[in-house]
Regions:
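Catalytic active-site module of serine/aspartate enzymes centered on a nucleophile-bearing elbow/loop
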Residues: 255-294
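Active-site glycine-rich loops that stabilize anionic/oxyanionic intermediates
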Residues: 26, 33-37, 105, 234-235
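Alpha/beta-hydrolase active-site loop
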Residues: 75-93
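Alpha/beta-hydrolase-fold enzymes
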Residues: 111-194
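Short beta-strand/loop motif that positions the catalytic acidic residue
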Residues: 230-232
Length: 294
């Protein structure tokens, strides 16, 4: 296995892309990290996949990671910019093997937008969620107006109200305990200078708008009939404790022939970082390579 770093450009933006390259790759996966984290957190997953003959491509999304200027951490102007970056990075994937997308949390929303563009041979949607209620519609409208007034402002109270007020579902004193039942992972996340940052009003507005957008039936109907693998924690409050994944499986199943769901018991939002993560990695490998062998 080799790790190769390269710089790509999307107009005036430099994108630092990392490839995990096996000696004889059988498939390739483009990974999209979640909100308020960065690509380096995924080293263990990427190493495992590469050691099992899966080529991996990852980069930091706008407003995230040490590549970003400090004043821009937690901010991006448009979800369309995230999609544009993703398509640039996609071009670096080898074209002679099956190409998959894997997105976690906010990254799953990016992936679900991209699925309408017929890029991938399969999709692994991890830790996704929905905001289907009337109060979510009101929140979307409120954030849209606020983003016109103070787009770059990062309000702690607004971040908690929008996405991060889930700790109350779990006993304990650790901040962000809703992410993971493994306390050591929570400690690492909370001590990471590039994880857990507040997002700007504009970024929150764009994220919420697109969470609601990707649930529209007319958007889902634009997908192609490729394999879909939905993965989440049964104790994840963002997915309403797995309900959103079950609803998405039903909706996809109305139109597409292969839709699989893995709801991991006792796992919270960051299912790829839970105590049983290696078992989850192994199931991802099997699912991808089963496709490659057909």
């Amino acid at each position: 296995m080799k790790i190769i770093n390269r710089t790509m450009r999307n107009k005036d933006r430099k994108i630092e892309v990392t490839h995990y390259v096996p000696a004889s790759p059988k498939a390739s996966i483009q990974i999209f990290h979640g909100m308020a984290e960065h690509k380096d957190r995924y080293r263990e997953l990427l190493t495992y996949l590469a050691l099992n003959d899966i080529h991996c491509v990852i980069y930091n999304q706008r407003g995230h990671g040490p590549d970003e200027k400090k004043e821009k951490l937690g901010h991006f102007d448009s979800f369309e910019d995230l999609l544009s970056d993703a398509k640039v990075v996609f071009r670096s994937m080898p074209a002679d093997i099956p190409r998959f997308g894997l997105g976690h949390s906010m990254g799953s929303i990016v992936l679900r937008r991209l699925l309408a563009d017929d890029l991938y041979d399969g999709a692994i949607i991890v830790g996704t969620g929905s905001k289907p209620n009337f109060k979510d519609l009101l929140s979307e409208k409120f954030l849209k107006v606020l983003s016109l007034i103070i787009p770059r402002k990062k309000l702690t109270s607004l971040n908690k109200l929008s996405f991060l007020g889930y700790d109350g579902n779990f006993k304990g004193r650790e901040k962000n305990r809703w992410l993971n039942q493994d306390v050591s992972e929570i400690v690492k996340y909370n001590s990471d200078p590039y994880s857990g940052q507040n997002m700007s009003v504009k970024a929150l507005s764009e994220i919420l708008k697109n969470i609601r957008y990707v649930d529209r039936i007319r958007h889902i109907r634009r997908y192609k009939d490729i394999p879909y693998y939905l993965i989440g924690g049964a104790d994840d409050p963002f997915s309403h404790f797995g309900r959103d994944l079950e609803v998405l499986r039903f909706r996809l199943g109305l139109h597409y022939s292969k839709v699989d769901l893995m709801l991991e018991p006792n796992a919270r939002h960051e299912v790829l970082f839970e105590e049983n993560k290696v078992g989850i990695y192994a199931r991802i490998v099997k699912w991808v390579l089963d496709y490659e062998e057909k």
